[in-house]
Amino acid sequence: MIRAIEYRRFGGPEVLEEVDRPEQAPDDGEVRIAVRAVGLNPIDFKIFEGDLQPVERVQRLIHPRRWLEGASARFPRGVARDFAGVIDAVGAGVTGLAVGDAVLGTLRSAPGQADTRGALTTALVAPAADVVKKPAPLSFTQAACLGVASQTACGAFRQLNLHEGD
């Protein structure tokens, strides 16, 4: 069993609860990570507080299979996306990553969407493509802060359309 923080309804920190979940084995192309640190971002709070429900409604309109989804299909949900830890299992077909590698990553989902998973857990399974080796000089805590923040910074640089010499 793993320990995780999740929520079953929208609200403030009072809706968060610690639960036991069954440990998952990684499927093809996935790795399981023993989580050492998690990065919390403003988007994480906005999601569990329910601030992004209008975005979720639009997402449901776009995907007809989700039109009849009730609350039970959307909950429970995990908290946080960014993590750092050590790989403890590797699925078939994974190359470049091995058991014992220190890594960092971000649990990816549609923009503004929550996920039933969550990085605020003792272990998680993620696609190997969403995980990179942690640079040795960084602590696990520092590495766990890179995901969403670095994506935001990269997006800003793309918007600025910077070129060499700018």
Identify the function of each model-found stretch.
Residues E6-R9, E49, I87:
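Residue-level signal for short segments within beta-strands and strand-turn junctions
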